[in-house]
């Protein structure tokens, strides 16, 4: 069979030359002959050069530094949604969380008040001027979970020097 013209490319096997039909081994600079691999200490990746490994580990270093900064910010800020503390929840609670309430299993879970059960709820004006907040968390006052004013307070609001 005749040899293909020189412009024809062989993608399947190693390149042949006209002068000899010997196979030439490909040596790539990306894969050195020593076949030494440099493993990353933080993930399962391996690299052929120490420089590539160094750059990769610098990326891990930056990720860890950013995570430490974020943890410091979160540790110094108050908890936003902590179910163990009592906080005001201005949005209606349409379902009962099965993980809140009694852990003994003998006591029934207390139903939280919702906006749908409160008197005077208007779905077209859901934010009245005096908003009835629902309380969650430990509420030991025996109430129904709605803040109510018993009597107006006599507060002295005058400023004196």
Curated annotation (Swiss-Prot):
GO terms for molecular function: DNA binding; DNA-binding transcription factor activity; transcription cis-regulatory region binding; zinc ion binding. GO terms for cellular component: nucleus. A zinc finger (C2H2-type) spans 38-60. InterPro entries: ZFP3-like, Znf_C2H2_sf, Znf_C2H2_type. First expressed in developing carpel primordia, and later in stamens and ovules of flower buds. It is found in: Nucleus. A motif (EAR-like (transcriptional repression)) lies at residues 155-159. One of its GO terms (biological process) is cell differentiation. Its main location: nucleus. Residues 1-33, 142-161 are annotated as: Disordered. Keywords: Developmental protein, Differentiation, Flowering, Metal-binding, Nucleus, Repressor, Transcription, Transcription regulation, Zinc, Zinc-finger. It comes from the Eukaryota. May function as a transcriptional repressor of cellular proliferation that regulates floral determinacy and relative size of basal pattern elements along the proximo-distal axis of the developing gynoecium. Contains a slightly degenerated ERF-associated amphiphilic repression (EAR) motif, which may be involved in the activity of transcriptional repression. PANTHER family: C2H2 AND C2HC ZINC FINGERS SUPERFAMILY PROTEIN, ZINC FINGER PROTEIN 3-LIKE. This is Zinc finger protein KNUCKLES. It comes from Arabidopsis thaliana. The lineage of its organism: Eukaryota, Viridiplantae, Streptophyta, Embryophyta, Tracheophyta. The gene is KNU.
């Amino acid at each position: 069979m005749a040899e293909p013209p020189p412009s024809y490319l062989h993608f399947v096997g190693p390149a042949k030359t006209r002068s000899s039909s010997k196979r030439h081994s490909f040596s790539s600079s990306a894969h050195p002959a020593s076949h030494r691999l440099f493993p990353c200490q933080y993930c399962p990746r391996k690299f052929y050069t120490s420089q590539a490994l160094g750059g990769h580990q610098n990326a891990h270093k930056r990720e860890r530094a950013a995570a430490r900064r974020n943890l410091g910010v979160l540790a110094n800020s108050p908890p936003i949604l902590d179910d163990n503390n009592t906080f005001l929840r201005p949005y209606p609670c349409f379902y009962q969380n099965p993980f809140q309430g009694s852990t003994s299993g003998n006591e029934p879970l207390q139903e939280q008040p919702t906006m749908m059960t409160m008197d005077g709820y208007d779905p077209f004006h859901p934010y009245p001027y005096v908003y009835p907040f629902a309380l969650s968390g430990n509420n030991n006052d025996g109430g129904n979970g709605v803040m109510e004013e018993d009597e107006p307070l006599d507060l002295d609001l005058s400023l004196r020097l």
